[in-house]
Curated annotation (Swiss-Prot):
PROSITE patterns: RUBISCO_LARGE. Belongs to the RuBisCO large chain family. Type I subfamily. GO terms for biological process: photorespiration; reductive pentose-phosphate cycle. InterPro entries: RuBisCO, RuBisCo_large_chain_AS, RuBisCO_lsu_C, RuBisCO_lsu_C_sf, RuBisCO_lsu_fd_N, RuBisCO_lsu_N_sf, RuBisCO_lsuI. The modification N6-carboxylysine is found at K201. The lineage of its organism: Eukaryota, Viridiplantae, Streptophyta, Embryophyta, Tracheophyta. Binds 1 Mg(2+) ion per subunit. Coiled coil: none annotated. The active site is at K175 (proton acceptor), H294 (proton acceptor). Its EC number is 4.1.1.39. It comes from Actinidia chinensis. Its cofactor is Mg(2+). This is Ribulose bisphosphate carboxylase large chain. It is found in: Plastid, Chloroplast. The basic functional RuBisCO is composed of a large chain homodimer in a 'head-to-tail' conformation. In form I RuBisCO this homodimer is arranged in a barrel-like tetramer with the small subunits forming a tetrameric 'cap' on each end of the 'barrel'.
């Protein structure tokens, strides 16, 4: 931005335009424990110094505007302004910088992810002085964390509700995602749960379409759940998608699910919005429902390396807004996910305290204090041959979700579920015996398939299936 002269006005302040860095770039600032800290990847326009670009981000996402205004004198800018307190170059990128910005806690409404994002990313991403801007990470202070309920129940309470311990949970997204009648949909749910899965799932775009209205789907799925439970002696669930066009309709669907006695509902938290999601999460805690979260639309926001918002920020926001599960990539399947970076935000979802670790993309130490954890869901292009790697990468506190990897079994849905359950139990047993899943995984699956014809058939069908593309989500 080219410097412009200030003019003296008769109202007693210096009107005009001045460089942002004069007010908002403060390299000597010592951050407070109560500050919200942000790490932005900044790509300035040619000729714009990094300090000016970083200061512009701090200004436009807090108290600043493009010109000096006389009402600045009616408040304490020094108390309320955002500050760009550090800038560092991005390795291997000549035109990109990481700008660290500190925001005073008083800028944000308590318990509102909506307000937090409106302030930090709501306006500044269209700023002309920047070619591109990406929010890489946020540090949420303990004082702000304590204003959020967070997940309705969390990992331990969910395990207690399900009475399932010592292994990942198994799920399946019902396919085809669109076009089935409610009765046929419920039949697929029953067959998968009866075969050994813990959960089945509505696809994210299954809401209430002409071919299958939500109430009919809920009824047939509830029947399938209770029938499978009575026959297996295990607690089962189906993620009934309550996402709707209005909050009132969403809540009506959640209330009906509770009245049916099912254990879990679902929400598309990005397309549905954070206000709706937080509302639903509060209802779920008050009424004993687990809440599964799908991240539909996330790649629109997080896929580009130099612009948008990294998924670790969306994951933190979800933990604050509320959800017991969230999709988090697979590392090994068809959807995006580089191993170290994926495990970085998986830890941010599950653990109470996470140390700064730039090798995994974690820019700040994060203390969640007593906020419950979220189960990461691995889903997308995975099958029985991936089971050893998934078990080793994600550990017990996860949901492994096989859609086509269940329903695509040559013998049908129930045998597909059996194959996945046998593969999982074999991997967990081998791990508990001290075997190396990364090195011996294929052998473990082959040995298990000798006494499970369902697993043997699945192994044969998917033995050549690979999704080998370079990951976009790299440091």
């Amino acid at each position: 931005m080219s410097p412009q002269t200030e003019t003296k006005a008769s109202v007693g302040f210096k009107a005009g335009v001045k460089d942002y860095k004069l007010t908002y770039y403060t390299p000597d600032y010592e951050t407070k424990d109560t500050d919200i800290l942000a790490a932005f990847r900044v790509t300035p326009q040619p000729g714009v110094p990094p300090e000016e670009a970083g200061a512009a981000v701090a200004a436009e996402s807090s108290t600043g505007t493009w010109t000096t205004v006389w009402t600045d004198g009616l408040t304490s800018l020094d108390r309320y302004k955002g500050r760009c307190y550090h800038i560092e170059p991005v390795a291997g990128e000549e035109t990109q910088f990481i700008a660290y910005v500190a925001y005073p806690l008083d800028l944000f409404e308590e318990g509102s992810v909506t307000n937090m994002f409106t302030s930090i990313v709501g306006n500044v991403f269209g700023f002309k002085a920047l070619r591109a801007l990406r929010l890489e990470d946020l540090r949420i202070p303990v004082a702000y964390c304590k204003t959020f309920q967070g997940p309705p129940h969390g990992i331990q309470v969910e395990r207690d509700k399900l009475n399932k311990y010592g292994r990942p949970l198994l799920g399946c997204t019902i396919k085809p995602k669109l076009g089935l009648s409610a009765k046929n949909y419920g039949r697929a749910v029953y067959e998968c749960l009866r075969g050994g899965l813990d959960f089945t799932k509505d696809d994210e775009n299954v809401n209430s379409q002409p071919f299958m209205r939500w109430r009919d789907r809920f009824l047939f799925c509830a029947e399938a759940i209770f029938k499978a439970q009575s026959e297996t002696g295990e607690i089962k669930g189906h993620y009934l998608n309550a996402t709707a066009g209005t909050c009132e309709e969403m809540m009506k669907r959640a209330v009906f699910a509770r009245e049916l006695g099912v254990p879990i509902v679902m929400h598309d938290y990005l397309t549905g919005g954070f206000t709706a999601n937080t509302t639903l999460a509060h209802y779920c805690r008050d009424n004993g429902l687990l809440l599964h979260i799908h991240r539909a639309m996330h790649a629109v926001i997080d896929r580009q390396k130099n612009h948008g918002m990294h998924f670790r920020v969306l994951a933190k926001a979800l933990r604050m807004s509320g959800g017991d599960h969230i999709h988090a990539g697979t590392v090994v399947g068809k959807l995006e996910g580089e191993r170290d970076i994926t495990l970085g935000f998986v830890d941010l979802l599950r653990d109470d305290y996470i140390e700064k670790d730039r090798a995994r993309g974690i820019y700040f130490t994060q203390d969640w204090v007593s906020l419950p954890g979220v189960l990461p869901v691995a889903s997308g292009g995975i099958h029985v041959w991936h089971m050893p790697a998934l078990t080793e990468i994600f550990g017990d506190d996860s949901v492994l979700q096989f859609g086509g990897g269940t329903l695509g079994h040559p013998w049908g849905n129930a045998p597909g579920a059996v194959a996945n359950r046998v593969a999982l139990e074999a991997c967990v047993q081998a791990r508990n015996e001290g075997r190396d899943l990364a090195r011996e995984g294929n052998e473990i699956i082959r040995n298990a398939s000798k006494w499970s014809p369902e697993l043997a058939a699945a192994c044969e069908v998917w033995k050549e299936i690979k999704f080998e593309f370079q990951a976009m989500d790299t440091l």
